[in-house]
Amino acid sequence: IGIESTIVDLTEDIPMILRPGYITPKMLEKVIGEVKMDPGIIASDSLQKPKAPGMKYKHYAPKADLILVDGEEEKVVAKINALAKEAVLLGKKVGIIGTDETIDRYPEGEVVSIGARSDEDAIAKHLYKLLRDFDEKEVDIIYSESFATPRIGQAIMNRLLKAAGHQVITV
């Protein structure tokens, strides 16, 4: 579906999710009871190193810098528009990842929809393809809305954070 599998360490008393994926913590808890998250996949600082090998480095990153913008939808759209306008004025080619609900509100740059915000499966499925498409379009910088959706949103955000090298602007 675009997002890799969930990795779970079962060698401890309480199983630990080493990489969030399509199987959510709630799904696991229904089958095996309490689970915890590897602190290294939650923390953005370099002090907490993830245990899963594929989680330790900037992963599936596009060639362009990727910056996530997180917050309330209206503020996110306004901030991405301001950042995109500034980048265009500096002569940069801008990519923007929005949703079906927001793409019409971005006048600058190469704007693509990752899907409907409510369709987590589509977001997960299209994530890496969109990043590769921006490579082909040779954009200099990509601004993306955040996708903290309730079901597999944690896995989606985990992959976006890794691709962005944890560059996040909160508005």
Regions from the PLM with identified roles:
Residues I1-V171:
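Active-site-adjacent structural elements in enzyme catalytic cores
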